[in-house]
């Protein structure tokens, strides 16, 4: 079976899901289950199980049975990210980490310098780092050199729902790093965006807002599940090459009245 492989572990689902912004913890849990996701992201700052206000959400997340992927959301320096990562490892008992180091409050674009610095230090400390990054090829290579075994390039700024804004760079990134697991993270707003990412050969997608803010989060979880599966199946089957001119699907050989119009 075609499975997702990350840091020596395999997963049936290629959809990763976030745990924030849902109308209620119960709807969050139902949406996660409907999506079929096996990895769920969470923030220590929002969902610290040691604090009373985070206990209810933590109980729901734990009951989902998903693998936990803590993130360093809100960190603006490598030092902050490393500190929060160590706290998350102690509290959530996992060395998996979605690394975020934000360089701009308006676009929430990752800070490439802080990201590489933090990735290098965290890899030395034994973390399995999945960095949230841009589609910049040079940056992605630096992250791999820093010890990351997978990458999480954005499709568009977080929460915008714009889909894949820079398809050329994303396509080039996929082509130049064919053996690196890559998860499109952030900016996906519709199931069709997820399908497109999978058709391009990306290994998985991670999203939150598109499901959490839908009118029916549970139904949207199902929609994204099917979209990811369809996109992956299409990629594996091999998409037809695009053409600049029309090509009839019905043969014209032997048709008595066919002629070419210039």
From Swiss-Prot:
Which subcellular locations apply to this protein? Cytoplasm
**Recorded GO terms, molecular function?**
thiazole synthase activity
Task: Tell me one GO biological process term.
Answer: thiamine diphosphate biosynthetic process
> Which GO cellular component terms are attached?
cytoplasm
Q: Would you say which domain of life the source belongs to?
A: Bacteria
Annotated active site: 98 (schiff-base intermediate with dxp)
> Might you give the EC number(s) for this enzyme?
2.8.1.10
Report the pathway entry.
Cofactor biosynthesis; thiamine diphosphate biosynthesis
The free-text function statement in the UniProt record for this protein reads:
Catalyzes the rearrangement of 1-deoxy-D-xylulose 5-phosphate (DXP) to produce the thiazole phosphate moiety of thiamine. Sulfur is provided by the thiocarboxylate moiety of the carrier protein ThiS. In vitro, sulfur can be provided by H(2)S.
Q: Which HAMAP family match?
A: ThiG (MF_00443)
How is the quaternary structure described?
Answer: Homotetramer. Forms heterodimers with either ThiH or ThiS.
Name under which the protein is recorded? Thiazole synthase
Source species, please?
Hahella chejuensis (strain KCTC 2396)
Name of the gene this protein is made from: thiG
